[in-house]
Amino acid sequence: MSMQYKSIKVQNDMFVSIIKKNKELMMILDYISQLNLPNFYIAAGSVFQTIWNYYDKKPLNYKIKDIDIIYYDANNLSIEDENELENNIINHFSKLGMDYIFDVHNEARMHLWKKNENANINQYKNSEDAIDQWIATVHAIGITKEKDEIKVYAPYGLSDIFSRTIRPIKHKNNTKELYDKKVESWKSRFNNLNIIEW
């Protein structure tokens, strides 16, 4: 039976076991967890694409463009502090020879960032609220660490990741244009994707 048809627990256990094989992602997760960022996740591409690469028998970081790190701190909406945090993370891993693009965002201030792009959204309630509204079900995924255990947040389940099904999340803040752009990016780097049109 394909993994996409297995029980939620079996899928979650397999997902975590594969993620743990990505040693660089684990190094990043360990480091970020030590920063004590509130409500943090490593999220989106670097997470679900690790699974795809595993089944493609590719290096686990193959074609991963960046590492998305999110957290939620409503008590500090400073863009300067967010940028400083991102630069510190970049510098830390650059010294270790891990020259990824790191995108670090405080989801508590995302409504302010979107406003600068002439888009009006409500302030997210927490990091999970942000992930719930991302562009595709495979994209809406995050891993965090609690008491030395990896925890997975997957509001739409893991079946689409295992079956490589790109399914839009038709939230009012999302658009066909943004979805199609993401789909083209994934198609250019990964094969055998099952695309569900907007």
Located regions from the model:
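Catalytic cores of the polymerase beta-like nucleotidyltransferase superfamily
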Residues: 1-198
